[in-house]
């Protein structure tokens, strides 16, 4: 009886604390928020001097953000569905409406809150964004007879502010199927091309500007200056965005979110994962445990280099896992690129989770995901951009994970990451290391991945990269690598007929990975590389050079 009375009193005490139930609320099954550290969460100091970019689905939206930031103004990409009230609360200095694949006269085309045009905030519309502005204010938008894509000559008719400091004509990049055929009342044309009369327009009283071309793309000459004019002459921004502030804000945010828990980071030795690891290590020190998974898909000498740099130089907790057999077993018989990526991503996470169980209080998985990683998989803001391919850092992961994600570089571009690496004190061999895909050499082998084919590719790639270094080109190009094709060709070596593999050389220039052009290498250099590969790598009798640009091709073959 005494026990029952005591139990009754305890239940009553709990009920007073939780009036709706005599039971303590269970935490089991509660969904934990995903942690994505980066500028969007660490931008308190920047919000009063920022530009909001409304994303209507353009593959170039992140390039707009990059152009703004390289002019030392903070930019945030938001959904086109953002309300005027939400924008008013953030009080940005200006708005940019991105391009997009839709047509403004389609019923299902994405639209923005019409209230944004009454806020008095300067607005720049690009391509679809320009057409949206024209339609809203009563102008007319029509479909072109033929889609205009590529370089066009832009003739500037007004140099007073938006085009201040530019010559009379420049090369611009066009990519559109619609055009503004007549301007709304109160708007004036600023520039034209031979086929587009209203290639740029303005309503200066409203501080609203629009361009049919893409100033954010490197193919537009002086495009960064056009963006700069909008930022400083129209929006009256101040130059305040720099990596020192980013480091301070992000380190503080990581400490706050992680607390006393531990973080596990998959370290590949590339600049992205390396910078992410060093940044997190600066925030939480020994609470970070890095894991290098030797999946058998890496280049020659990479494991040893990683040990030297991160154990020796940065004194990090670094574990090595030999999982070569697991990955090769998973890839046996697989030829589809998407299946390769997903299989490798899935196996990585399994390995990480197995290793993470050995670490006390681990709750977070760190990744070196960048802006281009996200846009190539799916729009970061849920906008209707077309999917290109599953990216190794985002799309290939299982939907259900036992660890929360920390992605401190998620909103940065590659050039910003390299600048960040310098300020964090990483060695030059990491800072200038060319991008290497998460699935490794598996997606540089067209067809099935086998130990024998991997070694052929490693040896050929080693020769090509070494010759690029000797020529003094390594730091000047974006990527240089070999691809092992799934075809064989007939050859003659000595007096015998051969039927062996083909290697493709790929060398591209780029500033961000979003667009790229093939490098015009010296034929003598190409000849030397070809001769060395054919003579030194067993199983190769032909070498070809890839002269495709992005777009329409991607940098990687798979």
Label the predicted regions.
Residues 2-36, 40-94, 101-119, 131, ...:
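RNA-binding accessory domains that recognize and position tRNA/RNA substrates
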Residues 123-129:
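Conserved helicase ATPase motor motifs in RecA-like P-loop NTPase domains
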Residues 367-369:
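Extended catalytic-interface subdomain
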């Amino acid at each position: 009886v005494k026990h029952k009375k005591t139990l009754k009193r305890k239940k009553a005490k709990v009920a007073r604390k939780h009036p709706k139930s005599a039971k303590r609320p269970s935490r089991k099954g509660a969904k934990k928020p995903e942690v994505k550290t980066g500028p969007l969460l660490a931008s308190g100091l920047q919000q009063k001097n920022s530009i909001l970019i409304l994303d209507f689905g353009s593959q170039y939206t992140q390039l707009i953000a990059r152009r703004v930031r390289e002019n030392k103004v903070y930019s945030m990409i938001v959904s086109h569905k953002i309300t005027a009230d939400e924008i008013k609360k953030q009080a940005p200095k200006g708005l940019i409406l991105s391009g997009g694949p839709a047509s403004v006269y389609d019923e299902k085309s994405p639209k923005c809150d019409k209230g944004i045009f009454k806020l008095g905030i300067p607005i720049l519309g690009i391509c679809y964004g320009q057409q949206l502005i024209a339609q809203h204010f009563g102008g007319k938008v029509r479909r072109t007879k033929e889609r205009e894509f590529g370089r066009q000559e832009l003739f500037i008719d007004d140099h007073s502010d938006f085009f201040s400091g530019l010559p009379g004509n420049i090369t611009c990049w066009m990519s559109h199927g619609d055009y503004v055929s007549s301007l709304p009342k109160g708007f004036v044309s600023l520039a034209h091309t031979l086929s587009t009369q209203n290639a740029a327009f303005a309503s200066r009283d409203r501080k609203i500007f629009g361009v049919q071309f893409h100033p954010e793309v490197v193919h537009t000459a002086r495009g960064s200056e056009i963006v700069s004019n909008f930022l400083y002459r129209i929006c009256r921004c101040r130059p305040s965005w720099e990596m020192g502030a980013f480091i301070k804000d992000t380190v503080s945010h990581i400490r706050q979110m992680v607390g006393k828990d531990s973080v596990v980071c998959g370290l590949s030795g590339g600049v992205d994962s390396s910078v992410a690891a060093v940044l997190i290590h600066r925030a939480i020190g020994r609470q970070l445990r890095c894991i290098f998974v030797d999946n058998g898909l890496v280049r020659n000498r990479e494991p040893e280099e990683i040990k030297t740099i991160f154990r020796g130089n940065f004194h990090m907790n670094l574990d090595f896992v030999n999982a070569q057999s697991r990955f090769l077993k998973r890839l046996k018989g697989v030829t589809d690129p998407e299946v390769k990526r997903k299989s490798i991503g899935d196996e990585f996470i399994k390995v990480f989770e197995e290793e993470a169980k050995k670490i006390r209080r681990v709750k977070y998985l760190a990744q070196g995901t960048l802006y281009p990683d996200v846009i190539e998989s799916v729009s970061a803001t849920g906008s209707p951009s077309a999917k290109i391919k599953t990216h190794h850092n985002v799309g290939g992961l299982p939907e259900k994970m036992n660890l929360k994600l920390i992605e401190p570089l998620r909103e940065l571009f590659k050039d910003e990451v390299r600048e960040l690496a310098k300020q964090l004190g990483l060695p030059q061999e990491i800072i200038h290391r060319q991008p290497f895909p998460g699935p490794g050499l598996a997606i540089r082998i067209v067809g099935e991945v086998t130990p024998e084919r991997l070694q052929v590719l490693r040896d050929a790639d080693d020769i090509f990269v070494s010759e690029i270094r000797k020529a003094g080109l390594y730091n000047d190009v974006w990527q240089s690598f070999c691809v092992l094709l799934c075809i064989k060709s007939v050859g003659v070596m000595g007096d015998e007929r051969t039927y062996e593999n083909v290697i493709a050389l790929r060398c591209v220039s780029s500033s961000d990975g979003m667009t790229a052009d093939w490098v015009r290498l010296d034929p003598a250099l190409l000849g030397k590389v070809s001769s060395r590969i054919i003579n030194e790598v067993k199983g190769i009798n032909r070498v070809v050079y890839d002269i495709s640009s992005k777009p329409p091709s991607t940098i990687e073959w798979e």
